[in-house]
């Protein structure tokens, strides 16, 4: 497990965690990020357990929404971040496989000029099923060809970027395929991508990735991303940034729990729960 120096001066950076049924694992992730001086937003994607309650108790602000997939939860978190003035988001999973102590590594790469920083996992093949090893190799090759530059780990959920970047891309994915689309579309738009080696914390959680359906979604994401680029799609104008959020140095005393309601013409409408 790689070590990283404690982060200072993280004003304007919000950690965003899309989460689904992560009650047994999410609290250490939230506390680890807070220890790095990073405020935390958890987007609870329709969990059937106590993910929202556990995350709020650990110090996170929580958005609760109907289940729509990881990609939808990420976009919801980015929209919330922009609306509340956050300049950068650190995206990571809530299952404990990403080490919060490595957050400074991604942040440093972003400050070094990269538009999108991806944490490249040091995967241990002996811990993976054969189909997963083959898929990882094939996916890296296909995304590299589609993006026009080498992308070693297009499936990693540990990322750092301006939230408006994701909102400016013509994304269609709602699940894990969104992360693949982001890599391809960002690279083809001429944005600067960087990959930073990170460790992986293995646990006994059953993967939420469906071997057949999510593999098909991956191939569709690659084809559709290339097609959208050939169709002349370009980055949309970046959304206006709200008044910059103040620096947060500690967890809020009473974390807010917010519901997200679907609305016509918008993917989600934020409303404070009663």
Q: Model-predicted segments: where are they?
A:
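Hydrophobic helical membrane-anchoring modules
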Residues: 1-9, 123, 146-148, 171-274
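Short loop->beta transition adjacent to catalytic acidic/histidine clusters or analogous donor-positioning motifs
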Residues: 12-13, 33-42, 50, 60
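Short hydrophobic beta-strand elements that form part
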Residues: 14-18
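Short, well-formed alpha-helical segments that are part of the catalytic scaffolds
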Residues: 20-35
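Acidic helix N-cap motif at the loop->helix transition within catalytic regions
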Residues: 24-28, 49-58, 101
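A conserved acidic beta->alpha catalytic loop
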Residues: 44-52, 96
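Acceptor/aglycone-binding surface of glycosyltransferases and processive sugar-polymer synthases
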Residues: 66-83, 100-176, 203-223
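Short beta-strand-to-loop acidic/aromatic patch adjacent to the donor-nucleotide binding site
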Residues: 86-97
